[in-house]
Design a protein with these regions (language model features):
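A generic hydrophobic-segment detector
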Residues: 103-135
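Alpha-helical scaffold segments that form or flank carboxylate-/histidine-based iron centers
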Residues: 4-13, 32-52, 80-86, 111-124
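Long, non-catalytic architectural segments outside compact domain cores
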Residues: 12, 19, 23-26, 42, ...
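Carboxylate-rich helix-loop segments that flank metal/cofactor sites and access channels
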Residues: 52-98
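Alpha-helical bundle segments that constitute or directly flank the non-heme di-iron/ferroxidase center
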Residues: 1-31, 83-107, 121
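Conserved alpha-helical segments that form or flank metal/cofactor-binding pockets of metalloenzymes
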Residues: 37-69, 126-135
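Alpha-helix boundary/capping and short turn/kink residues
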Residues: 33, 63, 106-110
C-alpha cells in the first residue's frame, strides 16, 4: 500500500469537505422542523469553513488542490429515510476526524496542525449535535 503524502491527504479532505457542503445543503433543504434546520445550517457552515481552511492550507503548501468533489453527497442524498441520511452524515464526519488524525500523525509543522485541529474540533462538535438530534 502506498503511503499518501501530506498534500494528498489534505487534497482528499478538501474533496470530501466539498461533498459535505453539498450534502449539508441538500439536507438543509429537506429539513422539516426548526431544530433540524438549525442543525443542518450549523453543519453547512462548518463544512464551508473547513473548505476555506483546507484551501488556505494547501496554498501555504504551494498547491491549490484538485478542484474535485467527492461522491459522499450523492450517497447521503440517495437514502430515503431522514435518520439514515443523518447517520451517514455522522459517519462522514467521523471519517474526516480519522483522516485528520492520520494527517497529523505524519508530523507536519504547526502551520498545518493548527488548521487541521480546528477542523477536527468543529467536526467533533457537529458529530455530537447530530447524535443529540437523533436521540
Amino acid at each position: 500500500m502506498t503511503q499518501l503524502s501530506l498534500e494528498e491527504r489534505i487534497v482528499t479532505l478538501l474533496e470530501a469537505e466539498r461533498a459535505g457542503v453539498i450534502a449539508a445543503r441538500g439536507l438543509l433543504s429537506l429539513a422539516t422542523d426548526s431544530a433540524e434546520k438549525d442543525l443542518m445550517a450549523l453543519v453547512l457552515d462548518g463544512e464551508r469553513e473547513s473548505c476555506q481552511i483546507l484551501g488556505r492550507t494547501l496554498l501555504k503548501m504551494g498547491t491549490r488542490g484538485s478542484g474535485q468533489v467527492g461522491d459522499f453527497a450523492q450517497k447521503v442524498m440517495a437514502l430515503e429515510v431522514p435518520e439514515e441520511r443523518l447517520r451517514l452524515l455522522i459517519k462522514g464526519q467521523e471519517w474526516v476526524v480519522r483522516k485528520i488524525d492520520e494527517a497529523i500523525q505524519t508530523g507536519p509543522g504547526k502551520e498545518i496542525v493548527l488548521p487541521l485541529t480546528e477542523i477536527r474540533y468543529a467536526h467533533d462538535i457537529n458529530i455530537g449535535k447530530c447524535r443529540e438530534y437523533l436521540e
